[in-house]
Amino acid sequence: MCQAIITQLKPGGRLVALTINPHLVPDRLPRVEHYHSGVTLPGPLYDGAPVEVTMLTASGPLQIRDYYWSQATYESVLRQVGIESIMWHAMQVSAAGFETFGRAYWEAYLAHPHSIVLEAPRDAAAAGCAELLLGEDRP
């Protein structure tokens, strides 16, 4: 999948993905009911383990099956397709979120978030790698 994504990025473009936090602590996950979203782990964590993501909406719960991948796996796969600069960004609460609910409300989520943002810019070296792999020159 990373191969397909990276070939669509122009040099200087970047992959930004909201993904399951590879540093999940199963017994510290915030309650779905408290934040209106969360994850359920049906079993132990391992690369490829299914994870149920639940979002509580006005029309009822929305459930999505996702999969857990370790940070090492994400980074290894991205490096295989020529991405060298990989950044992880913790979830943040806006000033309005703090103002509306207070800091104490967000403490559990910020300490153990179920999601994280992965950012991987495509540089010129990655562009060359993709062209070699595809055997073509992409704009």
What are these model-predicted stretches?
Residues 81-84, 102-139:
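Core SAM-dependent methyltransferase catalytic element
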Residues 65-88:
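Short alpha-helix
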Residues 54-57, 92-107:
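Class I S-adenosyl-L-methionine
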Residues 23-26, 58-73:
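Acceptor-substrate binding/catalytic loop of class I
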Residues 14-50:
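Conserved class I S-adenosyl-L-methionine
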Residues 22-23, 91-93:
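Conserved beta-strand edge residues that scaffold enzyme active sites
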Residues 1-14:
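A short glycine-rich, Lys/Arg-flanked "PGG" loop and its adjoining helix->strand segment in the class I
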Residues 1, 26-28, 98:
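Short glycine-/acidic-enriched loop or helix-start segments at secondary-structure transitions
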